[in-house]
Amino acid sequence: MDGTVTPSPITTAMPPVSALDAGTPTLPPEAPLAMPEQNLREGSLQVRHQRTSPPGIGVRRFYLIGGTFATTAIAVWVMLSVLWPDGISVLEGCLLGLFVLLFAWIAMSFASAVAGFVTVVARAGRKLGIDPEQPLPTLRSRTALLMPTYNEDPRRLLAGLQAIYESVAETGQLEHFDFFVLSDTTREHIGRAEELVYNALCDRVGGHGRIFYRRRADNAARKAGNVADWVRRFGGSYPQMLILDADSVMTGDTIVRLVAGMENNPDVGLIQTLPAVVNGQTLFARMQQFGGRVYGPIIAFGVAWWHGAESNYWGHNAIIRTQAFADHAGLPSLRGRKPFGGHVLSHDFVEAALMRRGGWAMHMVPYLQGSYEEGPPTLTDLLIRDRRWCQGNLQHAKVVGAKGLHWISRMHMLIGIGHYFTAPMWGLLMLIGIGIPLAGGDIDLAGDLPFSPARYWHGSSQGNAIWIFVCTMFVLLAPKLLGYIALLLNPRELRACGGAFRAAVSILLETVLAALMAPVVMYLQSRGVFEVLAGKDSGWDAQVRDDGKLSWPALLRSYGGLTVFGLFMGAVAYAVSPALAAWMGPVIVGMALSIPVVALTSLRRTGMALRRAGIFCIPEELDPPKVLVRASELRRAAALEPSLI
């Protein structure tokens, strides 16, 4: 582990196949690292203040928490003026409690987004000596690029890896890197196809002895176990490992700068990039990637600003110090039965928290471009993945109290847990807001029709309820507005997003579509929370990478019940009062139209038609980097080959 460079071994004879491997692996000599399981009931924080923490990090965090508290306090004071005059009933007390929690949630996001906006506009936030505008540094150590895969199309997978390999080679520093395809594939025919495509890739690029492949015989602990198996067997040869996802693409320039950042900061354990979502073709994928490109930096720069050296890990497109990971990130199996017990699902948060406990700095560098991923093509695919994340995040309830964690690491987990509980909380807030005037005894449905909760609240509070609604919407939508302003201040990015008018139309359309889909997401996230609490496991399936191609029967199965429920709620509301139905309209319409909305946003032709009109454009489409062009070329060529799976 001295960091010196040695050539990658070029094997002339196949090493003995380990009992850990299935199929025919191609691997270098083993260089084991011990990776003990960590004890969550014992331990202490090794380094309280990191050398690489930005100046004034305490002030930054005081701003975030103090700003959240102050903004929430003002909103609660106004809400009390709505509820207090006639005393607070039980329902009103429940409403107030939910309001405090939910407004604090969006107020914290707002405070973070404001910090992110200032950082983006000021072009600040660079750290660790990583400057993309400086000449490419010369490396001194070896790094392994790890690409885990699970039942993926091997041709598509390795097309992306080939593009990365070629981009690294163009930096002139390929000798510092080895590449590993780490398969957890369980379908034997896909495993055989992986070996064929891997060998063809090595022949094509001359990668024998530098690109390696293995498939685990037992894929215990999923992706976390996959990476841990590699660390325990081969980690001793590589001071750093860069973790990719099956759809990840990164430029060689960015990879080299990440490695140099690790070499120049020996107390840093992890550097996380901000992957830009690209290659979307369906309407849903394109609106997601546009939102990520315009609002994403505001959010990412904001959290990086107050995370400091206690940043989080997102599981891919990040570089990790191998020894630090081995020493501190061995995950224990949680006590109890699934879904809360067993292997840690959302392993990345926990690994980052344990590494920080062990004394290593964790950083995010959102300004470093050249890191890419693909998003799910449809809302259905997003919600399937989200259900797994829901279980993984709620499982953190068993980890958040672990001994010795930094309080920011605990905050990461609490935010992850809270993200899923906000869905049922918003639903309850809406229902209680309707129920209070109906249950209060002051409404004579026979004499006071048409009944409207909005009219009731407005009349009982001299208009303060309207101000509460307006302020809530402003705080909720502020990141979009700030993202647009930042875009206007960057002429190059603005042109690449279609110009000021088209970008504004894109933001408006994205907001409308997101609002239509919000009730669907709220309902299904709420159902996911209750399923996890009831003990239902999410399972582990391969992700859809290309067009969603949802059939009408599949849409009916997924959203038919929600559509009927929305129509029923609309009919009941209309029977009480047309004004009540109008007030509930956004939620009712979103549920009732869930099937056509999901169908429309899942269409490739709709997304591509909007692209031709300049809507939802991103810079990577106007002027795509070479690595993305190459990956697309290779994937198109792979799609023309006879299917292997």
From Swiss-Prot:
Alphabetically ordered keywords of this record: Cell inner membrane, Cell membrane, Glycosyltransferase, Membrane, Transferase, Transmembrane, Transmembrane helix
Record protein name field: Glucans biosynthesis glucosyltransferase H
Superkingdom of source: Bacteria
Compartments reported by the entry: Cell inner membrane
Residue ranges crossing the lipid bilayer per the database entry: 62-84, 99-121, 417-439, 466-488, 554-576, 581-603
Topology of this chain in the membrane: Multi-pass membrane protein
Gene encoding the protein: opgH
Enzyme kind, highest EC tier: transferase
Organism encoding this protein: Xanthomonas axonopodis pv. citri (strain 306)
GO cellular component: plasma membrane
